[in-house]
């Protein structure tokens, strides 16, 4: 029974590995039109990578819940969870960012042969995520908030962009994803938030008045996310993610 939570954690890792397969195969499709302009497209399989990362996030939540329910928490499980999270929410989203940077540069007239150096910022995501997890494992645990952005939250944000790319009907959204500087900003923001010590809401319900306040926050964030998804499609996940940051910072500002 004590190994059941670890099986969930290993499923998280398996989904992260499968996401990497979907991201890397078959790679970008590049062709030219009659005017000699590059026509670049990301493979549709990258959307399945997003599904794997979303699935890993669900499993990551369940393994902790199952461990507490079975009273099977262990030091081994904590370390295994961190190692799995680095792959599923660090390396896999980092490779999504890497592929999008390749796509962004390849869409430019002289961008096919861009130096690899310009793609390396994508690796800040797994580096910052690994640092954040190592700090989490060695810091004194807190029950009321996260210290810095949790790596699954960063991974989910990055994983939403392939769905925006493939299922968005808005040209301006595609133009944003085709802009390498937009990607650099996203990568730097996520990496900074992960290594920061900003207190962000953990939504750990402990009873009393704090529960009622957390429920209100959850309702606000869900309403913003759902309404944004109805208006903007998958880009609504980004809006909901920003709403989570704003609510967290306002909570810290307003709470004595």
Where are these regions (language model features)?
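Topogenic membrane-insertion module of multi-pass membrane proteins
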Residues: 1-61, 239-240, 244, 251, ...
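Interhelical loop and helix-boundary elements at the membrane-water interface
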Residues: 1-13, 66-86, 133-153, 199-214, ...
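Hydrophobic alpha-helical transmembrane segments of polytopic
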Residues: 8-11, 49-53, 121-128, 154, ...
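Alpha-helical transmembrane segments of polytopic integral membrane proteins
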Residues: 17-20, 55, 59, 93, ...
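Membrane-interfacial alpha-helical segments at the cytosolic side of multi-pass membrane proteins
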Residues: 17-25, 90-100, 157-164
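Interfacial loop-to-helix junctions that mark the boundaries of transmembrane helices
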Residues: 36-45, 109-118, 146, 173-181
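Multi-pass membrane catalytic core of lipid/isoprenoid biosynthesis enzymes
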Residues: 44, 51, 69-133
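C-terminal membrane-associated helical module and adjoining short loops/tails
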Residues: 143-256
């Amino acid at each position: 029974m004590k190994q059941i939570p670890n099986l969930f954690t290993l499923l998280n890792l398996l989904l992260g590995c499968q996401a990497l397969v979907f991201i890397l195969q078959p790679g970008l499709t590049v062709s030219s039109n009659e005017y000699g302009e590059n026509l670049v497209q990301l493979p549709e399989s990258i959307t399945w990578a997003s599904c794997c990362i979303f699935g890993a996030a669900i499993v990551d939540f369940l393994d902790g819940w199952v461990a507490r329910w079975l009273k099977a928490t262990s030091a081994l499980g904590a370390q295994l969870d961190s190692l799995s999270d680095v792959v599923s929410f660090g390396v896999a989203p980092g490779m999504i960012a890497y592929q999008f940077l390749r796509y962004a540069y390849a869409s430019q007239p002289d961008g096919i042969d861009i130096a690899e150096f310009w793609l390396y910022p994508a690796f800040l995501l797994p580096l910052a995520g690994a640092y954040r997890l190592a700090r989490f494992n060695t810091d004194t645990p807190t029950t009321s908030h996260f210290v810095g952005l949790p790596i699954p939250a960063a991974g989910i944000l990055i994983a939403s962009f392939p769905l925006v790319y493939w299922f968005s009907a808005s040209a301006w959204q595609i133009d944003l994803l085709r802009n390498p500087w937009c990607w650099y900003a996203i990568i730097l923001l996520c990496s900074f938030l992960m290594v920061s010590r900003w207190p962000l809401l953990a939504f750990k319900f402990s009873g009393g008045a704090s529960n009622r306040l957390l429920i209100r926050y959850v309702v606000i964030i869900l309403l913003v996310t759902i309404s944004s998804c109805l208006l903007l499609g998958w880009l609504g996940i980004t809006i909901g993610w920003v709403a989570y940051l704003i609510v967290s910072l306002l909570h810290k500002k307003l709470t004595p």
